[in-house]
Amino acid sequence: MKFTVVAAALLLLCAVRAEEEDKKEDVGTVVGIDLGTTYSCVGVFKNGRVEIIANDQGNRITPSYVAFTPEGERLIGDAAKNQLTSNPENTVFDAKRLIGRTWNDPSVQQDIKFLPFKVVEKKTKPYIQVDIGGGQTKTFAPEEISAMVLTKMKETAEAYLGKKVTHAVVTVPAYFNDAQRQATKDAGTIAGLNVMRIINEPTAAAIAYGLDKREGEKNILVFDLGGGTFDVSLLTIDNGVFEVVATNGDTHLGGEDFDQRVMEHFIKLYKKKTGKDVRKDNRAVQKLRREVEKAKRALSSQHQARIEIESFFEGEDFSETLTRAKFEELNMDLFRSTMKPVQKVLEDSDLKKSDIDEIVLVGGSTRIPKIQQLVKEFFNGKEPSRGINPDEAVAYGAAVQAGVLSGDQDTGDLVLLDVCPLTLGIETVGGVMTKLIPRNTVVPTKKSQIFSTASDNQPTVTIKVYEGERPLTKDNHLLGTFDLTGIPPAPRGVPQIEVTFEIDVNGILRVTAEDKGTGNKNKITITNDQNRLTPEEIERMVNDAEKFAEEDKKLKERIDTRNELESYAYSLKNQIGDKEKLGGKLSPEDKETMEKAVEEKIEWLESHQDADIEDFKAKKKELEEIVQPIISKLYGSGGPPPTGEEDTSEKDEL
């Protein structure tokens, strides 16, 4: 009898377990979607990490645009935005500004003045009226337009995963009220998605940076400057529990406004040059808008950008340059105005600047260097968290949340996985480890530095890539080596070699070296499993590094002192040999005295590479005692002040 009871219990257990499995199976892979005003983004938690998914155009962010062509075709995303210039009345965007609001809402009345498509009142709500081709007009609720964008994101995820997606986590601004949240959920339902959670965008961004994993209570300021909106939120996190303490911002400030300022500038400039007013040609204005947006993006990484438009207006071409300085000047008042909501949020939460533990930048417009500078200055030099693309951070956090809801066990330590566990760098003269990426930097990340040659007419530099915490490469772990050849003959320290380290989300390191003079390049790719360390080795190395820190410091000082003497001697040698500089101003006796002293020190260096710090310092002092009286004499006769250090610009040598 006992046996049957046990068997029944087992059966029951199996049935419950199977039911749980079924339940989990029903959910499938849950995706995280950032449904933005101007752009949307989708991510998924897969194989223990977040993947942000590129759309069919290869873009990781998709314009929140829907268009209806005269032929009756419906376009969503990039395709819709691309034909905005030719079909502005039937291209719908900014639906997020209308969703969940009533027709009489003052912000709706303000918005519809600026939208190129028609917004009408229906059931006390704003509806969008468009021509869907074949002479037919149709009205859509904002939820339906948002649903079309969500469908596009859902299809993007399905194409990547190779299976149906039915469940999602969708983000909304922290200030969205219940009606707006419910309307967003409804948009999901229309798109065939079960929206399991609606989470606040700033919370999602904080989760993306793993800030929910920190011990104790933390204050986090999220600065979110997107395409059309600006939101500042102050969150507190206490052991994984988030609370939005205060929010502020400007629902009408973002990248589009910066574009508008630049456009107005060029429209005025064009009128001044040609006497023609472009404003009345909708298509020309939209063409300009598209090119200005491209130029603005380019200016986040370069100092000027060209804007070229063929047959811009009445058959005439348009060609102008926009510099970063001009872009900043045109928008400076808007950039500065972003600080007021930050101040307000601090006041509302009763906190001082120094109480903020983390600053998180979100939204594509936070890539603008001036914005980053203003935020950093406001917080007295405190650096914001970095490492996740600002336009992907919200979707990233939504995907983490989605992973938890999918029942993925791996989400536990997620964000700890996504850092670079050890410092990465290259070997420079004297076996010194020159750091490019410090340990615990969140990946993906990219860092560049300029180096130079260590000897005259050096045709090749060898780039040795190491990981580890010790100041000297011999104590660190060699990851790979490659050569950059074909460097044209030049004195030491003259060639400029830019070394770039880039780690992608999969922890794959790419190191590139480029001779800035010739454009000559070479690179190496280092993957996780190739030659990498185990977590135990990493831990041991970090502990060792602390133990050895003191002796390492002494050794590095010795090498630095030697390098100082060497640089001083070679710099003098070059100047004495240059008739344009010191060489042309010295008397023959003085020249001979200096040449002899310099040669003597160079020879001594070659045979005493391992001398003590004191020896190197003494030799440098001896040389200075010979050189300085001669140079002082020159000063007396009005010569220019050549110092021994003149040409040694601050570049490490390879």
From Swiss-Prot:
It is found in: Endoplasmic reticulum lumen; Melanosome; Cytoplasm; Cell surface. There is a cross-link at K353 (Glycyl lysine isopeptide (Lys-Gly) (interchain with G-Cter in SUMO1)). The keyword Magnesium does not apply. The modification Omega-N-methylarginine is found at R492. There is a cross-link at K352 (Glycyl lysine isopeptide (Lys-Gly) (interchain with G-Cter in SUMO2)). GO terms for cellular component: cell surface; COP9 signalosome; cytoplasm; cytosol; dendritic shaft; endoplasmic reticulum; endoplasmic reticulum chaperone complex; endoplasmic reticulum lumen. ATP binds at residues 36-39, 96, 227-229, 293-300, 364-367. The modification N6,N6-dimethyllysine is found at K585. Transmembrane segments: none annotated. The modification O-AMP-threonine is found at T518. It catalyses: ATP + H2O = ADP + phosphate + H(+). The modification N6-succinyllysine is found at K447. Residues 1-18 form the signal peptide. A motif (Prevents secretion from ER) lies at residues 651-654. Residues 409-419 are annotated as: Interdomain linker. The modification N6-methyllysine is found at K585, K591. Pfam families: HSP70 (PF00012). Residues 1-80 are annotated as: Required for interaction with ELAPOR1. In unstressed cells, AMPylation at Thr-518 by FICD inactivates the chaperome activity: AMPylated form is locked in a relatively inert state and only weakly stimulated by J domain-containing proteins. In response to endoplasmic reticulum stress, de-AMPylation by the same protein, FICD, restores the chaperone activity. Residues 125-280 are annotated as: Nucleotide-binding (NBD). Residues 631-654 are annotated as: Disordered. Belongs to the heat shock protein 70 family. This is Endoplasmic reticulum chaperone BiP. The gene is Hspa5.
